[in-house]
C-alpha cells in the first residue's frame, strides 16, 4: 500500500534552469562500488567474495549490533572486496560488482501482502533486514 502526504517542497529559486529540460533516464553503470559502511553504526562484514554472482536486492553485507544490512543495487559478479574511497573522506571496505544488466531480482526480495497481523518485533526485524535506517542514520 502506498502512502501519500499533503504538501511537499516548493523551492522558488532556480526553477528556470530545469523547467524546459526533458527528464532523462540515467543508464545503469557497468560497475558499482558498495561501501560496507553506510551509516554511523558499525560497518558491515561482507557476505560475498570475489567471483560470487549476486542478484539485485541480495544482502551482501551484515553484522551484529548497531549495523544495518547492505544490499546489491545490481545483479552481476563480485569483482573485488577491497578498500575504496568513501564519500566521507575515509577509505572503507567495499564490494565491487560488475553489472550483468539482467536486473535479476533476488528471491530475498518479496512483497509483504499483509503487515497488520505482525507484531512490532516482527516489523522491526523486517525493517532491519531491509537495511532501512532512520534520520539519525542508525538502523531502526
Regions found by a protein language model. Name each.
Residues 1-43, 47:
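N-terminal, Lys/Arg-enriched amphipathic/low-complexity engagement segments
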Residues 42-47, 64, 106-112:
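Aromatic/His-enriched, Gly/Pro-containing loop or helix-boundary segments
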Residues 44-53, 57:
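Short histidine-centered loop motifs in beta-beta connectors
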Residues 54-67, 82, 93-99:
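Short hydrophobic beta/alpha edge segments that flank linear recognition/processing sites
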Residues 69-73:
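Small beta-strand-rich domains/subdomains or short beta-sheet motifs embedded
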Residues 76-78:
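Conserved hydrophobic positions within beta-strands
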Residues 87-135:
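Acidic low-complexity segments
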Residues 138-140:
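Conserved small/polar residues in nucleotide/adenosyl-binding loops
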Amino acid at each position: 500500500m502506498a502512502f501519500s502526504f499533503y504538501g511537499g517542497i516548493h523551492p522558488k529559486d532556480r526553477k528556470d534552469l530545469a523547467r524546459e529540460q526533458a527528464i532523462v533516464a540515467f543508464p545503469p553503470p557497468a560497475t558499482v562500488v558498495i561501501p560496507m559502511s553506510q551509516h554511523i553504526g558499525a560497518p558491515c562484514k561482507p557476505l560475498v567474495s570475489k567471483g560470487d554472482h549476486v542478484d539485485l536486492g541480495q544482502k551482501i553485507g551484515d553484522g551484529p549490533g548497531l549495523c544495518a544490512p547492505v544490499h546489491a543495487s545490481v545483479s552481476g559478479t563480485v569483482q573485488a572486496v577491497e578498500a575504496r574511497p568513501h564519500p566521507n573522506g575515509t577509505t572503507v571496505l567495499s564490494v565491487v560488482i560488475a553489472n550483468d544488466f539482467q536486473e535479476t531480482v533476488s528471491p530475498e526480495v518479496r512483497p509483504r501482502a499483509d503487515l497488520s497481523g505482525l507484531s512490532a518485533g516482527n516489523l522491526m526485524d523486517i525493517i532491519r533486514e531491509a537495511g532501512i535506517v532512520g534520520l539519525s542514520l542508525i538502523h531502526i
